[in-house]
Amino acid sequence: GATSVMIDGRVSALWHGGWSVGASWREGTTRARAAGLLAAGGQIRSRAWAIDAGKLGVFGASDRMALRLSQPMRVQSGGLMLHLPTSYDYASASATATDVAVPLTPFGREQVVEMVWSGPMLGGDLSINSYWRGQPGHVAAAGDDVGGAIRFVLGF
């Protein structure tokens, strides 16, 4: 098992003219409990953040456009301590185990840019979303991921 502590913070502001801005931050610490192969001393620090900007009334009175820059939750530092066999004595037929640090920090750092427009159209609601992800999954060698979606909702 493990014990995790997460701290979240968010600030936002609405301005005249339908403008809004916001920022969020999440910081976490996880400590693994010693059990089986897990040795005491493993600790992981993680972090995520996002910055948002939006505008209500871009092309009409009730449409909205927003932009988000973010980094999804990522291990910043730390890892697990494993109690593993590291040597073997053939004369006594016994293994010697020592605590080995296993780092869990990825080499990559995923970054995301998202843009969305939504508003009423043809008696329903239309939203158009596009995104770019650099180093998706926090994998340094991963190529960029680009995509989008169009959604139309019509109630009846």
Show the residue positions of the predicted features.
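Outer membrane beta-barrel transmembrane domains
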Residues: 1, 6-12, 22-140
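Outer-membrane beta-barrel "beta-signal"
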Residues: 53, 62-64, 143-156
